[in-house]
């Protein structure tokens, strides 16, 4: 799918890094109040992340544990790192010391491992449950019914070093914006049911992570509190 940013891009007459930062400012101008921007920096070098940081961005999203580990060691300590990709249980130990939010928890097994590794560092790690609402077999995550069943089991309540803070999803890779909207609405309905049934008195269950470069405008209309934007900020990787 050819990703089109939601604004007209200027002719790239500036050095590549400065040109990218102009994208960051324009994207930020489109983010609604109450929504946080996760700048998806995966596959981009630390130098580009540093420039975005210098422009005021503090939340960055990565999807590979080793790559994140290397970047975290060299970049400012006050960056809020989010892990946004599929996370294998055996990789949790590499990010547990510093990760702020894990977006894509798709099983009780993974929750247990995050809890185990967080305890080693005397931390509570915030996590989002990943929903599979897209009509694509390649997407990870739980169906809404599977997600609610996990919560119904109550086993997660015994985990003292993880905090379930909300839900995450990815919409289908399609030009059909009505379909994308319906998928976000399914995710919001699941979130609302879980909130009412399991987290009614827990204000920390409040995050809805959906929307990327090509569909974040719809996501914000459908209740997103976090949008994960990479290409519209940094462009395609050219390194």
Predicted regions and their residues:
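Short, Lys/Arg-enriched N-terminal segments with co-localized hydrophobic residues
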Residues: 7-20
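Conserved alpha/beta-domain cores
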Residues: 18-214, 222, 234
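Divalent-metal-activated hydrolytic enzyme cores
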Residues: 225-226
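Short, charged, intrinsically disordered terminal tails
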Residues: 237-238
């Amino acid at each position: 799918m050819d990703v089109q940013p939601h604004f007209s891009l200027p002719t790239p007459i500036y050095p590549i890094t400065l040109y990218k930062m102009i994208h960051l400012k324009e994207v930020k101008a489109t983010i609604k109040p109450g929504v946080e921007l996760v700048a998806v920096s995966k596959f981009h070098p630390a130098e580009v992340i540093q420039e975005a940081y210098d422009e005021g961005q503090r939340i960055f999203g990565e999807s590979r544990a080793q790559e994140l580990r290397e970047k975290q060691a060299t970049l400012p300590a006050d960056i809020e790192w989010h892990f946004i990709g599929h996370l294998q249980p055996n990789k949790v130990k590499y990010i547990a010391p510093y990760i702020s939010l894990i977006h894509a928890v798709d099983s009780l097994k993974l929750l247990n491992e995050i809890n185990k590794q967080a305890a080693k560092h005397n931390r509570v790690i915030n996590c989002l449950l990943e929903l599979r609402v897209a009509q694509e077999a390649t997407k990870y995550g739980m169906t809404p019914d599977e997600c609610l069943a996990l919560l119904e089991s109550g086993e997660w309540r015994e985990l003292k070093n993880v905090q379930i803070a909300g839900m995450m999803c990815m919409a289908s890779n399609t030009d059909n914006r009505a379909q994308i909207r319906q998928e976000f609405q399914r995710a919001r309905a699941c979130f609302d049911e879980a909130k009412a049934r399991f987290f009614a008195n827990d204000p920390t269950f409040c995050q809805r992570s959906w929307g990327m470069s090509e569909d974040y405008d719809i996501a914000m209309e459908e209740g997103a509190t976090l949008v994960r934007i990479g290409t519209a900020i940094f462009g395609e990787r050219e390194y």
